[in-house]
Amino acid sequence: MKLLYFAWLRQKIGKAEETLDPPASVATVAELIAWLKTRGPGYADALKNPKLVRVAVNREYVQGDFKLKPGDEVGLFPPVTGG
């Protein structure tokens, strides 16, 4: 699974992208975020409030209950605001 991090998520996690193989118990977006938070302090800080993180799977916005598949591309980024 390819993960892409944008804006302040990228800064806190310390990388723009990575390829990971989550455990079989990670089936949904919410479970992926919970698992990522266990990968270190940068992840835990960036993902501490999931309401501040938008997720796109294969370039489509999804909710936390969205079922993931091997090979998905998952983008995590802050909500877009207007000005």
Q: For the regions a protein language model found, what residue spans apply to each?
A:
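Ubiquitin-like/PB1-type beta-grasp interaction modules and other compact soluble beta-rich domains
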Residues: 1-82
